[in-house]
Amino acid sequence: FSGTQKKTAEKFSKEIAYLDKFCWKIEQKYGFTMSELEYGPGIAVPYFKDQEDTLEADIKVIKTAISGMKWKGKVMLEMGRAFVASCGYYLTCVHECKKNNDRNYCIVDGGMHQIQYDGQIRGMYQPKCRMYPDGREGKKEKWTICGALCTANDVLVRDIELTAPGEGSVIIFENAGAYAMTEGMSLFLSHELPAV
């Protein structure tokens, strides 16, 4: 494992070249042949709106770099977040909607203690999420979704466009399958954990 959320494929090539040189050196200098190498590349997950999904391109770069290794042992990839992020969703219910100084707010029963994306700070980046039921009648407006904690930091999303959210509406956060719940402070103030 050499890091997480890497933004450039060039890092994978450099790391694999370094590992190749290291494995080859151990074999040549000490006569010890490693049969396996496990590599956790740290492929980035596009958690937020307008982030590009580079998974396929990154895997091609990694495959090419591994194929070109001088060391010929077995390489296993620990794919971590890159493969499991899309396997989970976080659902939270709207408990109250209000307006303050021309800004719309949805207060939900969850919060930052239950969902936390790598790089998310007070809703500054918009995670991929939607409302259920969708297709309500009304005007599409910008909303700020705030959690249930008594802190101004508990902002999950700012300026998301929703049509007529109300009490009981469900906000569905995507890409919650890897660390999104465990990176939060789940038991903060003895709040219940979300159901799995």
For each of these PLM feature ranges, what is it?
Residues 1-98, 162, 188:
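Active-site loop/helix belt of alpha/beta enzymes
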Residues 74-196:
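Charged (often Lys/Glu-rich) extended helix/loop segments that serve as interaction or gating elements
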